């Protein structure tokens, strides 16, 4: 009988989980080399098989990742590459990682498989642990440039479209995005900003007044821009 895999990917979130399995932490940053660990917990009633495999990845302008084989300059050692996870059991995975070039990043995928459904489908869940190997180079405000920052009407709301570009070789993280109007402010989730990356930001604004400014909050500085009315040709 043919069996099919139903695979669920959970990426770059603050927590990766289903009601039965969790992995934590999901994201970890290190200076230079990594010497870390993560845990996988089986909250279900069925034993699970877990297979670990590291992958390199790139991220496009909209934040969507593309995965590939681990780049040869990244070296990863895992305490285990496969194991059985019993019901209610927590399993710790220890690892060491280094890279010939910094900054660099990779993801360790835990592919979790259990039983089959009544229709013969074998379910698999992929849980990510993402690792960033960073250097000591700090991003400064002059290395971040606004490409555009606009707002336009979108039904009963307004849509904000902005682009920001990292002109450096440093990795950084936008911790928070703030949009303000004459009488209000809204906060939005941040995102990682990779070396040389141009990042598209699309937000829905539901305030009563038109948005006027957008602000990106980094660890040690803020980057602001006025919001212009989008051209009707766009």
Where are these regions (language model features)?
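Sec-dependent N-terminal signal peptides
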Residues: 4-14
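Asparagine-centered strand-capping/turn motif at beta-strand->loop junctions
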Residues: 40-44, 162-168
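Intrinsically disordered, low-complexity Pro/Gly/Ser/Thr-rich segments with frequent PxxP/GP/PP motifs
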Residues: 68-101, 183-210
């Amino acid at each position: 009988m043919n069996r099919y895999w139903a695979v669920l990917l959970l990426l770059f979130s603050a927590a990766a989980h289903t009601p039965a399995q969790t992995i934590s932490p999901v994201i970890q940053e290190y200076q230079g080399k990594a010497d870390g660990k993560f845990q996988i917990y089986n909250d279900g009633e069925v034993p699970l098989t877990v297979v670990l495999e590291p992958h390199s990845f790139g991220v496009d302008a909209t934040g969507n990742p593309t995965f590939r084989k681990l780049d040869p300059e990244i070296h990863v050692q895992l305490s285990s590459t496969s194991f059985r996870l019993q019901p209610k059991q927590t399993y710790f995975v220890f690892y060491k990682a280094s890279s010939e070039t910094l900054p660099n990043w990779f993801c360790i995928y835990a592919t979790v498989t259990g039983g089959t459904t009544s229709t013969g489908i074998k379910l698999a869940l992929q849980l990510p642990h993402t690792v960033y190997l960073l250097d000591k180079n700090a991003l400064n405000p002059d290395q971040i440039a606004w490409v555009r920052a606009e707002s336009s009407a979108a039904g009963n709301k307004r849509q904000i479209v902005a682009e920001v570009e990292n002109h450096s070789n440093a990795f950084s993280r936008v911790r928070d995005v703030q949009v303000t109007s004459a009488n209000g402010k809204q906060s939005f989730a941040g995102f990682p900003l990779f070396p040389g990356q141009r990042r598209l930001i699309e937000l829905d604004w539901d305030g009563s007044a038109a948005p006027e400014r957008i602000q990106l909050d980094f660890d040690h500085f803020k980057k602001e821009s006025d919001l212009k009315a989008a051209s009707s040709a766009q």
